[in-house]
Amino acid sequence: MSTRKLQKRKILPNDSIYNSLLVSQTINKILSKGKKNIARYIFYKSMQNIEKIKNENPLDIFKKAVDNATPSIELRTQKRKKGQISKISIKTKLERRNKIALKFIINSAKKRSEKNIIQKLQGEILDAYNNTGAAVQKKEEIEKSKSPVNNNKKFISKNKKSKNKKQKKRLKRKKNIY
């Protein structure tokens, strides 16, 4: 066992304009090469553009867009016996779901074909708000692949049954010995 003390998780401060934790997480996801002021500028400028287009509170639009892009499960790879690798879907906490949704939105915004990143992010947020766009499609792909869960449950239940059979055989052997 290590003798090091466990580090406490750093609490992320809310952003200065919208006073929202979700916004500060998004700014940190946009961040590249340590230039946080540029990341803030990109996000706030895209929110201003959204406000001009929709004439609504941009924070509400952004929260709805993140809600539409959040998957209910997460796919993870698992190694089984004999080197088999399979994907298993796992239910995740709300905090983790939001992080995944932000990753989907920002990565799909970077792949868009608009002129600059501000327009790309603005377009992806509006698309996610309207339940269209690459981020929502990625969420739907993950939710369609829930079938590996059932395969995993069958695999686990077969192993449990076989262990019970082995235990019964051992008990019979012990009874025969005495």
UniProtKB/Swiss-Prot annotation:
PROSITE patterns: RIBOSOMAL_S7. Residues 137-178 are annotated as: Disordered. It is found in: Plastid. One of its GO terms (molecular function) is rRNA binding. Keywords: Plastid, Ribonucleoprotein, Ribosomal protein, RNA-binding, rRNA-binding. The keyword Ion transport does not apply. Gene3D superfamilies: Ribosomal protein S7 domain. Residues 137-146 have a biased composition (Basic and acidic residues). Belongs to the universal ribosomal protein uS7 family. One of the primary rRNA binding proteins, it binds directly to 16S rRNA where it nucleates assembly of the head domain of the 30S subunit. Part of the 30S ribosomal subunit. This is Small ribosomal subunit protein uS7c. It comes from Euglena longa (Euglenophycean alga).
